[in-house]
Amino acid sequence: MIALHFGAGNIGRGFIGALLHHSGYDVVFADVNETMVSLLNEKKEYTVELADGGRQTEIIGPVSAINSAVQEQKLYRLINEAAIITTAVGPNVLRLIAPSIAEGLKRRTSSEPLNIIACENMIGGSSFLKKAVFGHLTEAERELVNRTVGFPDSAVDRIVPIQHHEDPLKVSVEPFFEWVIDRTGFAGGQPVLKGALFTDDLTPFIERKLFTVNTGHAVTAYVGYQRGLKTVKEAIGHPEIRRVVYDALSETGEYLVKAYGFKQSEHEQYMKKIIGRFENEYITDDVTRVARSPLRKLGANDRLVGPAKKIKEPNALAEGIAAALRFDYQDDPEAVELQKLIAEKGTSRVLQDICGIQLHEPLHGIVLKKLNQ
């Protein structure tokens, strides 16, 4: 069975590619990085290291790769032959690979079910990809594709930091991972995917991850940056920052438990586990990397403002929002743009236009108060 995976980066190799290999698939990576493609074809394997005290390693292979930018005919053949297609390319790249997937599906002659799963840090990634792919198909072609091809949405969670190794194929990942897939979106039967969790309702898992992992990571990074700390581990080790993060996750937890029926005790354990992941001494993650793209992360439905709008007293979340508004890292284009908008329009207008926090909302005043403290 062939698994075609778009994206041979650290997440593709260290997370999704490894799980596909464990599930018995012959993994073929599709990427536009010719150096990475050539190395994978030369070595036919790579090393995954668990970032913990044991430094356990395993060899993933045999694997192969194609350059999807130049080996188009081979890509179309693989789309025809694949039992499953996955992606880990980043949300902004899904649109770029959609035309090639669409062309491959047009040429597909196999009547076997095929499932295409976007494993991205976004909500509804597979649905987004399906819409992008279908934009390149006629109505008749869409009907044919719908008969045998599924686009089940998924939620993924694993910290894979920026890293440098002597062996460019080696990748370090944290031991924890979560891959939750909406089983209602599959074409045909549920495929074998070892380590994945299948559910009829993905929403609780998506929001739990977004409002715990992503929220906690963001608050740690933004408040840590304001304190002049360099890494996530340093930031979460600071008593005052840890308190803000813990309080912020307690606030989001209040909403999650009420909205989705998670048991309070179990959610508290999940929350502590997430904070423990930030403390991993074997992962070096700069706060500037985690904090990047503040315009997106300050969006009305994203990790900070989204949960803050859903609870009565979002004091710690408001502190995180205030810290994000102060993020002025010069090497981040969005941070530069954010500070420009604040200078030109004022913080109140930015809260309304970027964050969707209107003047009449209590959160508006709470954030301004935090900024003035």
From Swiss-Prot:
Instruction: Cite a single GO BP annotation.
Output: mannitol catabolic process
Q: Which reaction does it catalyse?
A: D-mannitol 1-phosphate + NAD(+) = beta-D-fructose 6-phosphate + NADH + H(+)
Q: Which InterPro entries match?
A: 6-PGluconate_DH-like_C_sf, 6PGD_dom2, Mannitol_1_phos_5_DH, Mannitol_DH, Mannitol_DH_C, Mannitol_DH_CS, Mannitol_DH_N, NAD(P)-bd_dom_sf
Q: Where does NAD(+) bind?
A: 3-14
Going by the UniProt record, its keywords in alphabetical order are: NAD, Oxidoreductase
Recorded E.C. number(s)? 1.1.1.17
Q: Which Pfam families match?
A: Mannitol_dh, Mannitol_dh_C
Record has Transport as a keyword: no
User: What is the top-level taxon of the source organism?
Assistant: Bacteria
Q: Does the keyword Oxidoreductase apply?
A: yes
Q: What class of enzyme is it?
A: oxidoreductase
Q: Which Gene Ontology molecular function entries are recorded, alphabetically?
A: mannitol-1-phosphate 5-dehydrogenase activity
Q: Which GO terms describe its cellular component?
A: cytosol
Could you say which protein family the record assigns here? Belongs to the mannitol dehydrogenase family.
The cross-references to HAMAP family, in alphabetical order and at most eight, read: Mannitol_dehydrog
Q: What is this protein called?
A: Mannitol-1-phosphate 5-dehydrogenase
Lineage, highest ranks first: Bacteria, Bacillati, Bacillota, Bacilli, Bacillales
Name the gene: mtlD
